[in-house]
């Protein structure tokens, strides 16, 4: 959308730089201005629609982070690539409500998924006896949101985390 707006501004700038001898009544200029204003209105509508969906999703799951699956089953490295390509992140719940939102996705699909636990995490939800480095260097969440050590080679549900700075 920004590209379209910039293109319109560029055309307007070129028109203004070339003078008005080909458009003495200003019809072309007015047409360009009208088109640019239409694009701005459309952009505002799209932004509003996006924010409405974002607010509804975050209200519905109690978290401002969204956890989304493509229903694929992959290992940790494939998950990392998929989330990066989608401009998301490997889930890293920092609060109980975020972990609950993440667990809701897992429960709905009846699958486990990887997550990342930071060294300075204030919130953790390790299952009894965990973390267990002998089980593996990665972490997975079960359908209840409890965290377990696991191998990074396990094939688990692909879930990516998305959050927005507004």
From Swiss-Prot:
<dbReference type="Pfam" id="PF00059">
    <property type="entry name" value="Lectin_C"/>
</dbReference>
<feature type="glycosylation site" description="N-linked (GlcNAc...) asparagine">
    <location>
        <position position="122"/>
    </location>
</feature>
<keyword id="KW-0964">Secreted</keyword>
<feature type="signal peptide">
    <location>
        <begin position="1"/>
        <end position="19"/>
    </location>
</feature>
<comment type="similarity">
    <text>Belongs to the alpha-type phospholipase A2 inhibitor family.</text>
</comment>
<feature type="disulfide bond">
    <location>
        <begin position="138"/>
        <end position="152"/>
    </location>
</feature>
<dbReference type="GO" id="GO:0019834">
    <property type="term" value="F:phospholipase A2 inhibitor activity"/>
</dbReference>
<dbReference type="GO" id="GO:0005576">
    <property type="term" value="C:extracellular region"/>
</dbReference>
<feature type="domain" description="C-type lectin">
    <location>
        <begin position="46"/>
        <end position="161"/>
    </location>
</feature>
<keyword id="KW-0106">Calcium</keyword>
<comment type="subunit">
    <text>Homotrimer; non-covalently linked.</text>
</comment>
<protein>
    <recommendedName>
        <fullName>Phospholipase A2 inhibitor clone 06/08</fullName>
    </recommendedName>
</protein>
<keyword id="KW-0430">Lectin</keyword>
<dbReference type="InterPro" id="IPR016186">
    <property type="entry name" value="C-type_lectin-like/link_sf"/>
</dbReference>
<dbReference type="InterPro" id="IPR001304">
    <property type="entry name" value="C-type_lectin-like"/>
</dbReference>
<feature type="glycosylation site" description="N-linked (GlcNAc...) asparagine">
    <location>
        <position position="61"/>
    </location>
</feature>
<comment type="function">
    <text>This phospholipase A2 inhibitor binds directly phospholipase A2 in the presence or absence of calcium.</text>
</comment>
<keyword id="KW-0325">Glycoprotein</keyword>
<dbReference type="InterPro" id="IPR018378">
    <property type="entry name" value="C-type_lectin_CS"/>
</dbReference>
<keyword id="KW-1015">Disulfide bond</keyword>
<dbReference type="InterPro" id="IPR016187">
    <property type="entry name" value="CTDL_fold"/>
</dbReference>
<feature type="disulfide bond">
    <location>
        <begin position="83"/>
        <end position="160"/>
    </location>
</feature>
<keyword id="KW-0732">Signal</keyword>
<dbReference type="GO" id="GO:0030246">
    <property type="term" value="F:carbohydrate binding"/>
</dbReference>
<keyword id="KW-0593">Phospholipase A2 inhibitor</keyword>
């Amino acid at each position: 959308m920004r590209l379209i707006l910039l293109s319109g501004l560029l055309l307007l700038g070129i028109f203004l730089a070339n003078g008005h001898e080909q458009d003495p009544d200003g019809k072309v200029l007015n047409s360009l201005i009208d088109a640019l204003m239409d694009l701005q209105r459309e952009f505002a509508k799209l932004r509003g629609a996006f924010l409405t969906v974002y607010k509804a999703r975050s209200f519905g799951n109690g978290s401002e982070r969204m956890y989304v699956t493509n229903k694929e089953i992959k290992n940790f490295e494939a998950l990392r690539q998929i989330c990066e390509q989608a401009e998301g992140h490997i889930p890293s719940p920092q609060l109980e409500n975020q972990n609950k939102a993440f667990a809701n996705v897992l429960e709905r699909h009846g699958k486990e998924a990887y997550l990342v636990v930071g060294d300075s995490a204030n919130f953790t939800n390790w299952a009894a006896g965990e973390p267990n480095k002998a089980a593996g260097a990665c972490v997975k969440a079960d359908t209840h949101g409890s965290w377990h050590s696991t191998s990074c080679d396990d094939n688990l549900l692909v879930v990516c985390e998305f959050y927005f700075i507004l």
